[in-house]
Structure formats: C-alpha cells, structure tokens
C-alpha cells in the first residue's frame, strides 16, 4: 500500500504517472499519523523545480515492509526526497529475502 499526504486528485495523478494498476494507494495521510510512523515533516516552499505546488506541511518519504503479524520487517525513513529506493530494487530484495528466508536485522536495540 502506498500512502500519501496528497488529496485524492493529486494522489490519483501520481498513480497514473507511475502507470501501475496493481498498487493500492491511500491518500490524505495527516501529519500526526505521519509523526506516529517517525516520518520527517517538512514545511512546503511553494512550487517545486518540476512545478508541483507543495502542501503547507508534508511528510518526507518512508518505506516500511510490514510482516503479516503487523510488525515491521524493515524501515527506510528519509529526511530528504532524494536517494529513494527504486521499486525494482525493493522487489529484487524481497524476492531474495523470501527465497533465502533472510531474517530481519537491527533487532538488538
């Protein structure tokens, strides 16, 4: 599931842009819920370099792999919109994890 702070119209436009018909997309993620997921919150600065109007406040990217028991297997939390994991890399990693029964790491905190 992909979640966005964007409204339905803008979220739908992004889904069409990526060309996927198989992704489930949630929208209107509120800032308090984003904070619960430990996402970084940024203040909008008007139009981006590609002409998109930023929200007043919005969460920076996060990617969470959640196990069937609803615990986190892996989390990628970013403070900038750059160096996001590519979906093909995530899929390849998931295939490896499933095939090799690779355990979660970072569990000794």
Regions found by a protein language model. Give the residues of each.
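Chalcogenol-based redox active-site neighborhoods
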Residues: 1-109
